[in-house]
Amino acid sequence: MEFIDLARNRFSERSFSSAPLEEEKLYKILEAGRIAPTACNNQPQRFYVLKSKEALAKAAKLTYTYNAPVVILVCYVNAEAWHNPRDGFCSGDMDASIAASSMMFEAEDLGVHSIWLRGFDAGSVHQVFSLPDGTVPSLMLALGYPGEKSAPHKLHTMREPMEEFVVEL
């Protein structure tokens, strides 16, 4: 499948089955995040894999996880992220997002569905999972196979025309 078709067909899964995710597929998904581009190749991204009942229950109290069998907590280490000397911009959240996007599309290519989650308080996530100081939670990526009610959201195919996004200067 061409990438554009993969990107067009992928949707945020809101109905996961209880089927476990194979370790081989999880490894490939994590590898896609590991090799993702980062600012200055600093590689500040960190992945915390939540798959025990206890860890998944903690995540579900912090944000809606749709009963996914695996959730990857995507973080970055602030001290390892690139900081723009001109304006102080920190690349960490952007680097973590690029890694998560790579994992999301690798998952889709493997037949694994996903949903990007950010409806949580980062301080609470840091505390609940006892993250190291300087590690910043960026997002969670829920992974698994589609459940019985799996379907794209009604807004999935609604896209603005190209002219709304592109300006030639």
Regions found by a protein language model. Name each.
Residues 52-53, 75-77, 120, 143-145, ...:
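Fold-independent oxyanion-binding glycine-rich loops
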Residues 15-16, 46, 113-116:
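Short catalytic-loop micro-motif centered on adjacent basic/acidic residues
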Residues 3-20, 139-169:
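C-terminal helix-cap and adjacent tail motif
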Residues 33-34, 72, 80, 87-128, ...:
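Small-aliphatic-rich amphipathic alpha-helix that forms the alpha element of a beta-alpha
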Residues 25-99:
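Glycine/small-residue-rich phosphate/adenosyl-binding loop
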Residues 127-132, 153-154:
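Short proline/glycine-enriched turn/loop segments at secondary-structure junctions
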Residues 66-70, 112, 133-137:
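Short coil/turn connectors at secondary-structure junctions
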